[in-house]
C-alpha cells in the first residue's frame, strides 16, 4: 500500500511539472511556491502548504478538511504533503478557502479533482471560485490573475459552522481584503488538552492603484467591513493562529524547512489580538496615504 502511495505522489509531481499544468507567473510566485516539509501543528491539524502560502489539513475518522489551495502550481505539492503525512487525498471531503485571490484559491480546482471533495465558501466568494475570476467589487480586481474554476462549490448561506466527521468549524466572516473573506475556528486536542485553532484570513488593506478603502463605489463598505473583521478576529478565542500567509503569524521563527521546531511555542492566546492590532496600524497608514497621497514628480 505504501509503495502504491509513493507512486501516486510521484505521478502527481510529474503532472504538476508538465507543460499543460495550470500555472501563474508573478513576481513572487517562485518564492511563495518553495517546497516546505509538512508537519503537525497540534492534534489533528497539520501544515501542508508551501513555504510562502498556507494550506492546513484537519483530519477526522469520517473524512478530512483542507483549507486553502495556494497557487495553481502548488496543488501537486499540497497533495504530496497530505500523502507524506500518511493520509489520502481521497479522504479529503471538504475544501475551504480564506479568500479568492489567486495565491490562496488558485490550486483549489486541481485539489478538488484529486480528492473529489466539495468546496464550501462564503456567498460572496462562491462565484469567483467557480469561475476563477474576481468580482468587480474586489479591491484587487484590476490586477487579478485568472485561475482554474472549481466545480461543486456550495455557498455557506447563513450557516454559522460546518461539520465533517464530528469536527465543527465555526465561520468567522472577515470581509474587507476581499468582499467574501472568511476565517475559520475549530478545536484540536492532544492528550486531553483541547485548543482553539484559528485559520486567519488576510486583514491587510491591499488593492490595485485605483481603489480607495476610504470610499469606493465598487465596494462602498470596504472600510467598515475591514474594521469589523479586525474586531471579529480580536474577539475570537484563539490559542494557535495560522495565517493565510504563514510569516504573518511568525510560523517560520518556530519551524524550519524540514518542519522541525518546538510546537509549544505556537500556543499564544494573544496572537489573534496582535494580528488585529497590526492590521489596524497598517490600515490607518493606508487611510492616511489616501487622504494625503504622495505628490507625483514632474
For the regions a protein language model found, what residue spans apply to each?
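Bacterial N-terminal signal peptides that target proteins for export
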Residues: 1-8
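Bacterial N-terminal signal peptides
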Residues: 8-17
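Metallo-beta-lactamase
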Residues: 22-26, 34-36, 40-42, 91, ...
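Accessory terminal helices/loops
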Residues: 22-31, 191-193, 205-298
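Conserved beta-strand hairpin/beta-sheet module of binuclear metal-dependent hydrolase folds
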Residues: 31-85, 89, 183-205
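Active-site environment of divalent metal-dependent phosphoester hydrolases
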Residues: 36, 74, 100-106, 126-129, ...
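Divalent metal-coordination and catalytic microenvironments
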Residues: 44, 58, 68, 99, ...
Amino acid at each position: 500500500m505504501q509503495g502504491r502511495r509513493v507512486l501516486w505522489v510521484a505521478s502527481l509531481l510529474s503532472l504538476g511539472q508538465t507543460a499543460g499544468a495550470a500555472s501563474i507567473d508573478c513576481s513572487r510566485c517562485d518564492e511563495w511556491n518553495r517546497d516546505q516539509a509538512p508537519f503537525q501543528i497540534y492534534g489533528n491539524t497539520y501544515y501542508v502548504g508551501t513555504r510562502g502560502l498556507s494550506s492546513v489539513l484537519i483530519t477526522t475518522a469520517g473524512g478530512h478538511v483542507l483549507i486553502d489551495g495556494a497557487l495553481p502550481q502548488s496543488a501537486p505539492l499540497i497533495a504530496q504533503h497530505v500523502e507524506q503525512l500518511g493520509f489520502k487525498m481521497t479522504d479529503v471531503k471538504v475544501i475551504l478557502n480564506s479568500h479568492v485571490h489567486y495565491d490562496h484559491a488558485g490550486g483549489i480546482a486541481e485539489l478538488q479533482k484529486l480528492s473529489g471533495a466539495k468546496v464550501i465558501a462564503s456567498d460572496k466568494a462562491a462565484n469567483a471560485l467557480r469561475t476563477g475570476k474576481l468580482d468587480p467589487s474586489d479591491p484587487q480586481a484590476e490586477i487579478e490573475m485568472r485561475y482554474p474554476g472549481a466545480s461543486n462549490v456550495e455557498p455557506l448561506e447563513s450557516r454559522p459552522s460546518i461539520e465533517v466527521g464530528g469536527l465543527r468549524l465555526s465561520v468567522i466572516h472577515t470581509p474587507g481584503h476581499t468582499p467574501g473573506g472568511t476565517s475559520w475556528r475549530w478545536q484540536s486536542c492532544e492528550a486531553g488538552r483541547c485548543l482553539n485553532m484559528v485559520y486567519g484570513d488576510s486583514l491587510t488593506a491591499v488593492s490595485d492603484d485605483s481603489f480607495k478603502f476610504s470610499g469606493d463605489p465598487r465596494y462602498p463598505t470596504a472600510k467598515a467591513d475591514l474594521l469589523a473583521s479586525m474586531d471579529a478576529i480580536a474577539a475570537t478565542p484563539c490559542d494557535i493562529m495560522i495565517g493565510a500567509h504563514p510569516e504573518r503569524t511568525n510560523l517560520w521563527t518556530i519551524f524550519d524547512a524540514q518542519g522541525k521546531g518546538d510546537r509549544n511555542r505556537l500556543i499564544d492566546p494573544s496572537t489573534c489580538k496582535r494580528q488585529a492590532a497590526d492590521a489596524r496600524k497598517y490600515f490607518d497608514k493606508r487611510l492616511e496615504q489616501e487622504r494625503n497621497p504622495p505628490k507625483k514628480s514632474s
